């Protein structure tokens, strides 16, 4: 199946007003403006965007708003690394969208370079929160580090140093795993584009959890709040269900909100298209189907939350800090589900239906070959 060449203008992309998404609380961190500034500083320092138009598109994307909506417990001294990670993620996503095949993107080489930037760091005492590391906020007039690695790898390495130095080894391992899956998913998306293949629903859910970058984004909830969920609870059936369902809600809603833009650029790895193909229905019926799925996922999430509360209540030896970490993480996942919708409904990244990308520069990945 190929995507339609014309984009229907009458598609209803938002859920009905009584949808379960709107029953989740809307949140907003007070740090939005500072986050918007930091995002542009990261992009400027590492020269990650293609000139004034792309820089303006980055500004108009309002990534700071997305972070502010989805990380309501974000601590002031942790803004810069979070802003840096989202800058990296959106730029690399746009870069890969410009390649017709994984080979053209040099995917294997790129993945190894990015993962090399994510080496384990000693899990010592976290730096004092009232004394962030020197140079915590990048400055526009700073020169990027000199070396053989490409700018996106250099930027990720700096972001990772600031993130990992505050986190446990277990958190670092989980984040690195999720980042590897995120990078792996680019190859499958490129294969789909190359062969104009809309994926089957049977494998799409797992692919989309990885390609959407939502799993490392949820890991960052713990960094942002300065509270880590105990490792055993992370592996509980209840919390795994909550993470999976929150991830699915975010990426499937994103598929709906980005549909018009993805039809224009020829993207085929989209849940709405997968549903349309599998069920043999039109795009609007597929969108409605997706939102019914999202409502069911939220219901499963909330029932798992109740079960997790019971588990924590009977788990002898849990500290108050552990319970607070679980509560904050749960609250953050709800903020992500709602905040992604509210941000995506107005961000020019999706509202502006065009082919402008933040960067088309292959040197950011370390290669000059283009499709």
Regions found by a protein language model. Give the residues of each.
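Alpha-helical, largely C-terminal catalytic domains
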Residues: 1-371
């Amino acid at each position: 199946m190929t995507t339609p060449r014309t984009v229907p203008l009458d598609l209803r992309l938002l859920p009905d007003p009584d949808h379960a998404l709107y029953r989740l609380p809307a949140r907003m961190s007070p740090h939005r403006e500072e986050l918007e500034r930091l995002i542009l500083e990261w992009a400027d320092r590492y020269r990650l965007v293609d000139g004034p138009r792309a820089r303006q598109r980055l500004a108009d994307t309002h990534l700071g708003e997305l972070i502010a909506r989805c990380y309501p417990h974000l601590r002031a001294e942790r803004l810069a690394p979070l802003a840096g990670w989202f800058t990296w993620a959106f730029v690399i996503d746009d870069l890969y969208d410009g390649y017709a095949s994984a080979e053209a993107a040099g995917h294997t080489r790129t993945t190894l370079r990015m993962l090399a930037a994510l080496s384990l760091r000693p899990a010592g005492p976290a730096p004092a929160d009232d004394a962030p590391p020197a140079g915590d906020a990048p400055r526009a007039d700073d020169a990027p580090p000199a070396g053989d690695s490409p700018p996106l790898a250099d930027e990720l390495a700096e972001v990772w140093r600031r993130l990992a130095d505050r986190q446990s080894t277990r958190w670092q391992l989980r984040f690195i795993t999720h980042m590897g899956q995120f990078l792996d998913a680019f190859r499958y998306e490129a294969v789909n584009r190359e062969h104009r293949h809309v994926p089957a629903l049977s494998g799409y859910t797992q692919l989309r959890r990885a390609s959407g970058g939502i799993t490392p984004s949820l890991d960052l909830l713990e960094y942002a709040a300065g509270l880590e969920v105990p490792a055993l609870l992370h592996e509980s059936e209840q919390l795994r269900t909550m993470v999976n369902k929150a991830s699915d809600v975010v990426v499937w809603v994103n598929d709906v909100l980005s549909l018009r833009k993805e039809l224009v650029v020829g993207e085929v790895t989209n849940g709405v298209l997968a549903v349309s193909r599998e069920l043999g229905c039109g795009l609007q019926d597929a969108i409605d189907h997706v939102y019914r799925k999202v409502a069911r996922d939220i219901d499963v999430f909330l029932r798992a939350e109740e079960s997790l509360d019971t588990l924590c209540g009977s788990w002898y030896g849990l500290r108050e800090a552990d319970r607070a970490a679980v509560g904050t993480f749960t609250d953050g996942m709800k903020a992500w589900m709602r905040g992604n919708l509210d941000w995506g409904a107005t961000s020019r990244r999706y509202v502006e239906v065009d082919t402008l990308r933040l960067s088309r520069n292959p040197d950011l990945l370390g290669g000059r070959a283009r499709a």
